Amino acid sequence: MSGDGPDGALSDAAHGAHRAAHKAQHAAAEVEQHRAASWVEALGQSANGLVHIVIGAIALGVAFGAGGSADQSGAMRALRETPIGGVALWVVGVALVALALHAFVIAVAASRRHRRDAVRAAGRGIGHVVVGTTALVFALGGSIDGEEATESVSTTVLQHPVGPWLLAVTGLVIAGVGVAFVARGVRRKFFDDVAPPRRFRRLVEALGTPGFVAKGIAVTIVGGLFVVAAVSHDAGEAGGLDGALQSLTTVPGGVVALVAIAVGLMVYGVYCVTRGVWAR
């Protein structure tokens, strides 16, 4: 019999919520183990890898004086200009949105016993949704400028009294994510996500280590730009991935660093494909 009074009602509600959460975690765990999940992982990670390879190629061109936006929007624009651009964008968009849903399922399944893994999975899911949605917008004939969107949001934030603080915190969080990527590469922690056959382990290590380090450095620079924008109260200083990579061309030795990061991003893209094939 349910408890009487407000306290009893609250207790019943709490137990009901706990049971619902447990059922959701159990259902998510079953979905995660389904054979279809491995196909979603393989296709989604391959799409993710393709996007990174294209971004890296554009960044390499920027280092040698070519134009282009070395970010997700630039990658989608480049894909759209290929003979199979429309089909490629639809495949990439759908695959990444599906991969995002898969990541959210993992987050729910891990939320009770592995909180850190759940947070990481949820973060990946959000990232995949953003990139997948961008691909679908381009597939439908639309366009998104990542740098303009970043500057617009930063301008709006800086108009509020606590805006600079919010922008600075955002930058520090992004930089923290970048540092985590670097650490994951240096410590070979990416093997937590991929289980290649023994004969391919060194290949995956040769891809994952520089790939994670390069992506981590790029993301850290993005975070740094947000902090600079917050300190200078200038939204124009904030930038996304393209802004971060373009900024390297203005500092001594930056072009060399940009070439290294560009190659690293392409290597990371190949790693993503291996992760899709040999996901743990």
Feature map (PLM): residue ranges:
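Alpha-helical transmembrane segments and their immediate juxtamembrane interface regions
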Residues: L101, T170-V173, V177, L245-W278
